[in-house]
Curated annotation (Swiss-Prot):
Phylogenetic classification of the source organism: Bacteria, Pseudomonadati, Pseudomonadota, Gammaproteobacteria, Enterobacterales
Record-given protein name: Phosphoribosylformylglycinamidine synthase
Keywords: ATP-binding, Cytoplasm, Glutamine amidotransferase, Ligase, Magnesium, Metal-binding, Nucleotide-binding, Purine biosynthesis
Highest taxon, organism lineage: Bacteria
Residue numbers binding ATP: 307-318, 386-388, 678, 886
Length: 1295
């Protein structure tokens, strides 16, 4: 039976206004819209009055429900029938954890009530199309239609293909019907194999073969034999990549054979809880570094949010499934798309060439895709710390003559680093009889065909198969699985995981054969043991679907009880679905039909399938010389600063958590003005050291339109000039991921790909001492469509994205582009040696040209000398700032440095030649260093020692003020105010934020950037930062116990425990399942801290599901109430823990006036480094800090204080319960965005109880308790930041 319950309003006023404006623009006469959430409960038994009241209360969250009956025509938007939304999975979990077992499933829709003039049926269809994502949702005309969401079908049997009766044609028909993308020789191979077996194949076997042997999974082109211009080539592409490892194997521990590569890290104290006692402590051991970079291009073109989200999620799983289990740590994200054409903000170079109906626009991708990628990283609890963004779409004269080149099929890049124990780098042995396990969520009918679909050019497959390729993300489930993996690797030698892979393309049909085959075994499986939420699925759908957040593992049978215990504690679902066998054979039994859908020798599936041969021709690009007749430097500056590739990326940065883990030493945002210009990302290796890891990206794809090899060399060079900003040492410590995107089969592209791989794998990397131990390829970067009567194609440039990874010697020595105005000198290191080529530059692009001669690596020895010189200068602390030269050239390098330093620049470019346009806008390798004036001679001498004398040019200096002046021989070349340039540079991010977020907030942020008087972040302390007030108490040896409380989806508990540990506490890991299961009580604890994260993925209100699981469980409710009433206890709630505790007001004495925390005013997750002041309040944790003003990490989507009315706010203030407020950089309490990131009244961001024993706050002091973890800080701070005082206050209060 289904029950319908109304929910809160679904859209803020500005979202409704945006919808109305879209309808008006489409000439749809819609006058008013009201939208509210509607909940549908699928019940297996009726609820009594108490249970009904509980369910009703559970579904009350967010803004207050409208009391009026909505008017207008109803359009109900729900998930597509036959799918289960991530919201549904999490909400159902909450209901069950609150004891409502009668609820089989909760689902949510949005009821739109539309008041409109008379509309035709077609116009109503247009209205409906604006309200939903056709790939994921459907529209019903009535609420009761939602019953279709809960219809269960009978299981479907396996289907056989009559190969023996119909011959080869049966396979050809199945290939088309199932979208298998099989090549002719593969059809021949299958015909021969099954004829030998003497039986017909089942559809599931063909599908499994197609996924396991797709280009996406098997990388056939990279393993192919090559004939170029009639000459056989000596090596495959992959062999040339492997040559880098054969030449420079140094520091590599694992390459080419696992889900990620591994290199040597540093010996540090890894901080985690003991399995038996729950007590956190440091464990001194090597923290080796793993690295992986994936792409998820096809799904992102079809449905950007889930496409990008599952792209990030899949890469995170690759990291976790490395060796015998590892820990993902920090991420990177990148996008290449066609021109944005922002409505009302179209740029002169952005022609509309049309697109296929089935893919979304570049603007849609960049609106939704980054949000999806960020949301997954945020909810999983991994900071995303670097990235890139390129737009390109133009008709150019390239290798194949004049044609359309661009990214209608986008690049969505997802990568990152992690850590792994030394003894877990290599996978173990799968013993015969080992249990074969699926860890993670249930099978669902989603993502079918992802591997094969990704291997086709967009436009080749059937639209229904595109629907089938759309995936669904549930990062909170993946976090639970990762917690299980963490518990396993933390057991060291007792780790129960023998072997692990992630489930990606092809689902279990790819993952399980790969698992047993890699382990040298076979497998015997039972289909019906696979967890499934949809009983009507066929065997093919159960075995081959790509439900996300799953891993496959081999666990020894005697270790199963331990594994079961770990999974239950973390509430991570798992199923034992088979056993490892001696014989390398794969069998899948189906209990329901008592038949055998799969019965194959593994070598048929994964054996010597036909090897590809690429017989291709070389084409040379001619290009056209740049026509510069109408180009002025002033206009060029304006245009280039508006090119999205160059322009400010704040709209892509602040949506992503950049502080979780407490180990982020360098994020994108630089300096007191938080400008997103960092060259690389840096993390600390642990919470007790200054060793670390660095990541950077290099990518110069448009150059490939003129010179394939040069483009590849520049990508490597740019990654190197970016990562050189931190202290690494030996260049051999740097390891690269190479991600290759090409339109294989397009004239000239295959030979160009070979040239590019050879240039990097056989030449440049070996010469530099660089290794490429990991990478990925995507070989179908083309879209086809009909535009009127014309057949069109959009082909991407050959695109190599290089991600560089390295161990860092001392993270404190990382340089940024932030200029200093002390007596200084700016020096250009020009690795282009005066070539100043303008082909395929940003300058050429904004004037709709390509040019003829591009930049290149001019001298490999000098590139190596540059890196070595930078390392010497970084180690000697001789540099004040560094920024590489890349898109936009020297002009942009200097401008971004001035933006970061909020200062002026006076430079002279006479030494760079007479062609000022080329000097300022060429994109040759190199960059600008800033040195102290007195160090200039010594620095130039050192650069000369490294062979760079002819590359170094003195430019001028940074000055206080607002003028950005470029001269040549004292003649002005360009002069403008830095503020004007900053505003131009920011306009793209402003317009994107206006479109995507609350436009009022976007306007306020843009206005703030234009304020030259802004002093930037600053610090005022009312206490001595160097005083350790906890030291006398630590000296007694007594360590009070703090319960570090987490719920499923939590993610800030480790750094929280470390902060309390440093202050003299014994931090104990306490999961809510421990309390609900009665394994642990709160009676033995002196302090309680509820940590941040996304409990239940913020479903049913941030923190509210967590709170209600306490309030609706009588025994646990009593535990908390007793704790809060006990004298001599302390409690802290941070972020998600703050939201949770604010919903426990009925249990906490003196908290009656506390507010609720609701959706940010921007309607967006906000990750900021915000200035707060400590106000006078009873809070025991903030004693002695009153009046202090300092920045703190902020990461939340629902942090806005909501009070009932003005009287409630006045009472909260008059009682003095406000503990922290947001202030602007002038020290004034603010409600203005982004200084106040959520719009809370009076800047309120922390409150306390009347006795001060319980304090709750939205910002994260635990993430910045170490100075090194602050995005910016005064140079005189030591190891501890001022926020460490909170934790020491806690220790002092407990005596």
């Amino acid at each position: 039976m289904m029950e319908i319950l109304r929910g809160s309003p679904a859209l803020s006023a500005f979202r409704i206004n945006k919808l109305l404006a879209r309808f008006q623009a489409a000439n749809l006469q819609v006058h008013n819209i009201y939208a509210e959430y509607v909940h549908f409960a699928d019940l297996n038994a009726p609820l009594n009055d108490s249970e009904q009241a509980q369910l009703t209360r559970l579904l009350q969250y967010g803004p207050a429900l409208s009391s009026h009956t909505p008017a207008g025509k109803l359009l109900l938007v729900t998930p597509r029938p036959g799918t289960i939304s991530p919201w549904s999975s999490k909400a159902t979990d909450i209901a069950h954890n609150c004891g409502l077992q009668q609820v089989d499933r909760l689902e949510r829709g949005v009821a739109y009530y539309i008041e409109a003039s008379t509309l035709t049926a077609e116009q109503w269809r247009q209205v409906a199309a604006e309200l939903h994502d056709r790939m994921m949702e459907t529209v019903f005309p009535s609420l009761t239609d939602a019953e279709k969401l809960f219809i269960h079908h009978q299981p479907a049997p396996v289907s056989s293909v009559d190969l023996l009766g119909e011959g080869r044609q049966a396979l050809i028909d199945a290939n088309l019907r199932l979208g298998l993308a099989l090549a002719e020789d593969e059809i021949d191979y299958l015909q021969e194999a099954f004829t030998k077996l003497g039986r017909n194949p089942n559809d599931i076997e063909l599908y499994m073969f197609a996924q396991a042997n797709s280009e996406h999974c098997r990388h056939k082109i990279f393993n192919a034999d090559w004939i170029i211009d009639g000459k056989p080539q000596p090596k495959s592409l992959f062999k040339m990549i492997k040559n880098t490892f054969e030449t420079t194997p140094d520091y590599v521990l694992s390459a080419y054979k696992d889900n990620a590569a591994v290199m040597e890290g540093s010996a540090v104290g890894r901080y985690f809880a003991d399995h038996n006692t729950g007590r956190y402590d440091f464990h001194q051991e090597p923290a080796h570094i793993l690295m992986k970079v994936e792409t998820h291009n096809h799904p992102t073109a079809i449905s950007p949010w889930p496409g990008a989200a599952t792209g990030s999620g899949g890469e995170i799983r690759d990291e976790g499934a490395t060796g015998r289990g590892a820990k993902p740590k920090a991420g990177l994200v990148g996008f290449s798309v066609s021109n944005l054409r922002i409505p009302g903000f179209e740029q002169p170079w952005e022609e509309d060439f049309g697109k296929p109906e089935r893919i979304v626009t570049a603007l849609d991708i960049m609106t939704e895709g980054p949000l999806g990628g960020a949301a997954f990283n945020n909810e999983f609890g991994r900071p995303a710390l670097t990235g890139y963004f390129r737009t390109y779409e133009e008709k150019v004269n390239s290798h194949n003559g004049e044609e359309l080149r661009g990214y209608h099929k986008p690049i969505m890049l997802a990568g990152g680093i992690g850590n792994i124990r030394a003894d877990h780098v290599q996978k173990g042995e799968i013993v015969v009889g080992a249990k074969l396990i699926v860890l993670g969520g249930p099978a669902m009918n989603i993502g079918l065909g992802g591997g094969a679909a990704s291997s086709m050019a967009s436009g080749q497959s059937d639209a229904d198969l595109d629907f089938a390729s759309v995936q669904r993300d549930n990062p909170e489930m993946e976090r639970r699985c990762q917690e299980v993996i963490d518990r396993c690797w933390q057991l060291g030698d007792a780790n129960p995981i023998l072997f692990i892979h992630d489930v990606g393309a092809g689902g279990l049909s790819n993952a399980m054969p790969e698992l047993v085959s890699d382990g040298g075994r076979g497998g015997k499986f039972e289909l019906r043991d696979i967890l499934s939420d949809e009983p009507g699925m066929s065997p093919l759908e159960i075995w081959c679907n790509e439900s996300q957040e799953r891993y496959v593992l081999a666990v020894a049978a005697d270790q199963l009880p331990l594994f079961d215990e770990l999974c239950k504690r973390e509430r991570a679902p798992y199923a034992v679905i088979g056993d490892a066998t001696e014989e390398q054979h794969l069998s899948l039994h189906d209990n329901h039909f008592d038949n055998q859908p799969i019965d194959l020798p593994l070598d048929v599936l994964l054996g010597k399938t036909p090897k590809m041969t690429r017989d291709v021709q070389t084409l040379k690009a001619k290009g056209d010389a740049l026509n510069r007749a109408d180009i002025t430097i002033a206009d060029a500056v304006n245009r280039v600063l508006h090119l999205p590739t160059v322009a400010e990326k704040t709209f892509l940065v602040t949506i992503g958590d950049r502080t979780v883990t407490g180990m982020v030493a360098r994020d994108q945002m630089v300096g007191p003005w938080q400008v997103p210009v960092a060259d690389c990302a840096v993390t600390t290796a642990s919470l007790d050291s200054y060793y670390g890891e660095a990541m950077s990206i290099g990518e110069r794809a448009p150059v490939a339109l003129l010179d394939f090899a040069a483009s590849a060399r520049l990508a490597v060079g740019e990654a190197l000039t970016n990562i050189a900003a931190t202290q690494i040492g030996d260049i051999k410590r740097i390891k690269l991921s190479a991600n290759w995107m090409a339109a294989a089969g397009h004239p000239g592209e295959d030979a160009g790909l070979y040239d590019a791989v050879k240039a990097v794998g056989e030449e440049l990397c070996p010469q530099l001492g660089l290794t490429i131990p990991v990478g990925k390829d995507s070989m179908s970067m083309k879209t086809r469509w009909q535009e009127g009567n014309e057949q069109r194609e959009m082909t991407s440039p050959l695109s190599l994205v290089i991600s560089a990874f390295a161990r860092v010697e001392d993270v404190r020595h990382t340089l940024t582009p932030q200029l200093s105005t002390e007596d200084n000198a700016l020096l250009l290191i020009d690795l282009g040696k005066g070539h100043n080529a303008l082909g395929a530059t940003a300058l050429a692009q904004v004037y709709r040209q390509l040019g003829d001669k591009p930049a290149d690596v001019r001298d490999v020895a000098q590139l190596k000398g540059f890196y070595d010189a930078m390392q010497a200068l970084v180690a000697a602390r001789k540099l004040l700032a560094w920024h590489d030269r890349s898109d936009g050239g020297l002009l942009v390098t200097l401008a971004e440095m001035a933006f970061a330093g909020h200062c002026g620049v006076q430079v002279d470019i006479a030494a760079l030649g007479d062609d000022h346009l080329a000097a300022l806008f060429n994109e040759e390798l190199g960059g600008v260093i800033q040195v102290r004036a007195e160090d200039r001679d010594a620095v130039e001498a050192l650069l000369a020692q490294y062979g760079l004398a002819d590359c170094v040019h003195y430019l001028g200096q940074a000055l206080a003020g607002d003028r950005f002046v470029i001269t040549a021989n004292d003649q002005t070349v360009f002069s403008e105010s830095r503020t004007t340039l900053r505003v131009w540079w920011a306009e793209t991010t402003w317009q994107m934020q206006r479109l995507r977020d609350n436009p009022q907030c976007a306007d306020q942020e843009h206005e703030a950037k234009a304020n030259d008087a802004d002093p930037g972040l600053n610090v005022k302390l009312s206490f001595d930062i160097n005083e350790d007030i906890a030291a006398p108490y630590i000296a007694t040896g007594a360590r009070p116990k703090v319960a570090v409380l987490r719920e499923q989806g939590g993610n800030s508990h480790v750094e929280m425990a470390a902060a309390f540990h440093r202050a003299g506490f014994d931090a104990i890991d306490v999961h809510m399942s421990d309390l609900l299961g009665g394994r642990i009580g709160l009676g033995n604890f002196h302090a309680l801290v509820a940590c941040g994260g996304f409990s239940y993925g913020d479903v049913l209100g941030a923190g509210e599901g967590w709170a209600k699981s306490i309030l609706f469980n009588p025994r646990v409710r009593d535990e908390f109430e007793t704790f809060f009433h006990r004298p001599q206890t302390l409690a802290l709630g941070v972020c998600n823990g703050c939201q949770m505790m604010s919903n426990l007001r009925e249990l906490i004495p003196g908290s009656e006036l506390w507010p609720r925390f609701v959706r940010n005013h921007s309607d967006r997750f906000e990750a900021r480094f915000s200035l707060v002041e400590v106000t006078q309040s009873p809070s025991l944790l903030l004693q002695g800090m009153v009046g202090s003003q300092m920045p703190i990490a902020v990461s939340h989507g629902e942090g806005r204080v909501e009070v009932r009315d003005d009287a409630h706010l006045a009472a909260l203030e008059s009682k003095g319960l406000v503990a922290l407020r947001y202030v602007d950089n002038f020290g004034k309490v603010t409600e203005t965005y982004p200084a106040n990131p959520n719009g809370s009244p009076n800047g309120i961001t922390a409150v306390t109880t009347e006795n001060g024993r319980v304090t709750i706050m939205m910002p994260h002091p635990e993430r910045v308790f170490r100075t090194v973890a602050n995005s910016w800080h005064p140079e005189n701070w030591g190891e501890d930041s001022p926020w460490m005082r909170i934790f020491r206050n806690a220790r002092k209060q407990l005596g």
